[in-house]
């Protein structure tokens, strides 16, 4: 019983962890930032990058993916930012606040200068254009030449797996799975309780039946005892009639029947 509840609890925790994702950090211009921040400031919420960029002609071509977290696709010196809904409903760029991530010994460092030089020489012109922003300003033309290399270092993540927003359907499925697991656990408890009660009732009825049979069969056992068997008595009748015997010599009585001697 306890094992069933432990399994249900572990599965629920895994579903919640999959729905909300685990937090991580990413590098940007030599700093670590939290990877799962969805609010640039208190009271504001980031819009989905694909939805916001679809309505803007000046949005960065590279983008940041299908999510609503703070990123820096155009290498803004102020750090990561995101789109928020403006007064007229038009997406507006807003820098993210309180986004710093504490460094740990297990975090990877940015690419070295040697790797940057090799990366700048390796890819061709077509590959460089994939990382270069389309709306780079003329004043930043010199910095735009190294932006493709910075874009490569920016993709160094603490988590190799990019988090995805499951959306409302994912949350609904997670809650449904939790409800099903709880229902299964409750069903197991009820089934066990019912079966246990039924077994106890059958044992009680069997004991009552055995006591009743003992009470009924006890008087009959007395008659099966050999010492208590009843024997039929036989009446013996003795008759007093005598068989006539012939008289012999010497056997004549000295006195007759009439009582006269010598008769």
Curated annotation (Swiss-Prot):
Residues 242-251 have a biased composition (Polar residues). Residues 1-21 form the signal peptide. It is found in: Cell membrane. The chain crosses the membrane at residues 169-189. Keywords: Cell membrane, Disulfide bond, Glycoprotein, Kringle, Membrane, Signal, Transmembrane, Transmembrane helix. Its main location: membrane. Negative regulator of hepatic phosphatidylinositol 3-kinase (PI3K) activity. This is Phosphoinositide-3-kinase-interacting protein 1. It comes from Pongo abelii. The lineage of its organism: Eukaryota, Metazoa, Chordata, Craniata, Vertebrata.
């Amino acid at each position: 019983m306890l094992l069933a509840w432990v399994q249900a609890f572990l599965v629920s925790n895994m579903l919640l962890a999959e729905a909300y994702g685990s937090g991580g950090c990413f590098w940007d211009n030599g700093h670590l930032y939290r990877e799962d921040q969805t609010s640039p400031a208190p009271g504001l919420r980031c819009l989905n990058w694909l939805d916001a960029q679809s309505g803007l002609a000046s949005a960065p071509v590279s983008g940041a993916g299908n999510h609503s977290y703070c990123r820096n696709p155009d290498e803004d010196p102020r750090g990561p930012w995101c789109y928020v809904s403006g007064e007229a409903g038009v997406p507006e760029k807003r820098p993210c606040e309180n986004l710093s991530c504490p460094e740990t010994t297990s975090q990877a460092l940015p690419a070295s200068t040697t790797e940057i030089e090799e990366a700048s020489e390796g890819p061709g012109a077509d590959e460089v254009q994939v990382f270069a922003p389309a709306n780079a300003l003329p004043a930043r033309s010199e910095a735009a030449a190294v932006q493709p290399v910075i874009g490569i270092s920016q993709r160094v993540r603490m988590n190799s797996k990019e988090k995805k927003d499951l959306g409302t359907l994912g949350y609904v499925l997670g809650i449904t799975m939790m409800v099903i697991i709880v229902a299964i656990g409750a069903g197991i408890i009820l089934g066990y309780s019912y079966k246990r009660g039924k077994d106890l009732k059958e044992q009680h009825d069997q004991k009552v039946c055995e006591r009743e049979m003992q009470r009924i069969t006890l008087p009959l056992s007395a008659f099966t005892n050999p010492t208590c068997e009843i024997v039929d008595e036989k009446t013996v009748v003795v008759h007093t009639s005598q068989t006539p015997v012939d008289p012999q010599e010497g056997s004549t009585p000295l006195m007759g029947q009439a009582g006269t001697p010598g008769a």
